[in-house]
Structures are given as C-alpha cells and as structure tokens.
Amino acid sequence: MDKKIILAIESSCDETAAAVVVNGREVLSNIIASQIDTHKKFGGVVPEVASRMHIEAVDSVVKAALLEAGISIDDVDAIGVTYGPGLVGALLVGLQYAKGLALGSKKPLIGVNHIQGHISANFIEHKDLKPPFVSLVVSGGHTFIVHVKGYRDFEVIGQTRDDAAGEAYDKVARALELGYPGGPKIDKLAKQGNKDAIEFPRAKFQDDTLDFSFSGVKSAVLNYLNKAKMKEEEVNKADIAASFQKAIIDVLKTNLFLTCERKGIKKIAVAGGVASNSCLRETLLEEGRKKGIEILFPSPILCTDNAAMIGSAAYFNYQEGAVSDLNINAKPNLKLGER
C-alpha cells in the first residue's frame, strides 16, 4: 500500500491543533494547544479571544507536530485543514496558515469538514472499521445521526433543531454553578444522584423524523431551579444533573437505535466531545449488547477537537481526488456532505 503522509491543522473553535497522520489511520503526532483555561473565566468561548490565541499558537503547534513525527514539510504528501463548520475567525487562522504552507511547499491543500473529522476519529481508533455504519456525532456545537455510506458519502438522518446536546450541558452546568466546560462536571456530579428523581421532558417530533430538540429539557431544568429559588427550597444538584443527563441520553439512544433498525445496520461509531461521557458510553454499550449491535468509541483524546481526526478525513478525501484550490474560504455553517 502506498504510504501517504498528511499534515493536518484544526482551529474551528478553542483548540489550536496540528497532527501528522499516515494513510488515515496511523498517528505520528497529535499536538493540541487548548484555550480552555482562558475561556473558563468567561463561562464559554469568546470568538475574538479564540481567534487571537489561534494566531499566537498555530505556527509553533504545526512545527511541534512535524518535530514529534520526525519529518519535515518535504516528507508530507498533502496538507489537510478544517474549513467549517465553526467560528469564522477561528477557522480563518488555520485555513490561511495552511494555504500559505501549501503554496510555499507546493503541496496539495485538502479542505475538511469538521463533522467528517469527528466521524473519521473512529478510523484511527478502530483500524479495521469500514463503511457502512451509523455514526452519532455529539458535541458542544453539533448533534447528528449520520448514515456513513462511504468515506466521503454521508446521509444525515437526524440533527438538532435548536441547542446541541453539549450546549445544553454547558447551559445547565452554568445554572447549577458547576463551571465551564459543563459536560464533564455534570457527568461527574450525576454519579452521586438519582437519575429517576425528576422527570424532565424528552422532545419527540410528530413528523416521524429522528431530529433532536434539547432546548425544552434545558428550559425545564432552569424552570425547576427558578421555582425552587422562589420558594426558597433546597435543591439536590446531583439529582438534577443525573435526571437531566438521563433525559438527554434517552433521546440520543432512542433515535440512534431506531436509525439502525430502519437502515438494517449493526454497527455504530460514536464521535465528538460528548462521546467521552461515561453515562452515554455505558448506556449505548448496554443497549448494543441487548440488540446485537456493535458500539465503537474513540479514545477521549480523539473525541474532543484534534487534528489527527482531520488528518484521517483529509487522507480519504485525497484518495478520492478531493483536492481544494487556494481560493477555498472558511464556511462557518458548512453542511456535512456539502461540496
């Protein structure tokens, strides 16, 4: 098999990342400069701050990725970069840097959809994984169920119509005064609570769609807290966290396994930051055992934003001749499968 080396850059939100990936599955380096400690002070990501920090970090992160991989830019076959979806200012930093690098080194440039990147993290973790399978992509900014028909062939089966699951986690964590990022904090606190203590709503649409809505459960938690505050009642934060988390995961589980049933597929690959959630993992693995469906997860380092997953996706794009020209622009609202 021909060995193809991809240098990948990711800067769609609050991580500046670069990686070197061979043939879409072998990671030689995966460098991440996280901005989380900075944004924590603001209770969420501040786009202008994120862009400035990407500018400060991108050059050293890319150089560190090449150094750790033990290669130079001359050894690279192509440069992969996230061009959407994400924060436009943040995306532009990585994209402009990658363009300059591609121009200077005369290497092909490959634009990558960030969601495709998350799905591709499973190709790194599970070396024998091949399409078709169903993927659940669940993170702070995205919630999708995708029928992965090929390495670049995606059918979106369900998506959120309002808040992403991870976004709801962050907002509820803020209301519970747990801090940012909210996902890991709610996951940890929920272990001490009773998941059946409070019946929070689960949104279901009448039109037979497998779309999601998480604004209702988020609002229900906020209303519950406001009522308790007005009555000057004590609340059990662990019970709230556990009950909220169960409501979110119940809906994800139901729609995900319905997709498998409708498509006749027996393999699920979960991806995105929320894929690190211990309750989600346990729930899906248990349901998978009952239904005879294989459930795959990436390692936690490959769940959150990273460039290795972008390198994997870029490789499969490159193999199918999907090379970008230097006029490619950042697309903050890029759809999965959009060319």
Curated annotation (Swiss-Prot):
Gene Ontology CC: cytoplasm
Record key words, sorted: Acyltransferase, Cytoplasm, Iron, Metal-binding, Transferase, tRNA processing
Keyword Iron: yes
EC code: 2.3.1.234
Catalytic activity entry: L-threonylcarbamoyladenylate + adenosine(37) in tRNA = N(6)-L-threonylcarbamoyladenosine(37) in tRNA + AMP + H(+)
Annotated positions binding substrate: 137-141, 170, 183, 187, 277
Keyword Coiled coil: no
Enzyme class: transferase
Cofactor binding mode and count: Binds 1 Fe(2+) ion per subunit.
The protein's required cofactors: Fe(2+)
One Gene Ontology term of the molecular function aspect: iron ion binding
Principal cellular location given in the protein's record: cytoplasm
Localization per Swiss-Prot or TrEMBL: Cytoplasm
One GO term of the biological process aspect: tRNA threonylcarbamoyladenosine modification
Top-level taxon: Bacteria
Binding site for Fe cation: 114, 118, 305
Function in brief: Required for the formation of a threonylcarbamoyl group on adenosine at position 37 (t(6)A37) in tRNAs that read codons beginning with adenine. Is involved in the transfer of the threonylcarbamoyl moiety of threonylcarbamoyl-AMP (TC-AMP) to the N6 group of A37, together with TsaE and TsaB. TsaD likely plays a direct catalytic role in this reaction.
PANTHER family named among the record's database cross-references: TRNA N6-ADENOSINE THREONYLCARBAMOYLTRANSFERASE (PTHR11735), TRNA N6-ADENOSINE THREONYLCARBAMOYLTRANSFERASE, MITOCHONDRIAL (PTHR11735:SF6)
Protein name stated in the entry: tRNA N6-adenosine threonylcarbamoyltransferase
Species this chain originates from: Clostridium beijerinckii (strain ATCC 51743 / NCIMB 8052) (Clostridium acetobutylicum)
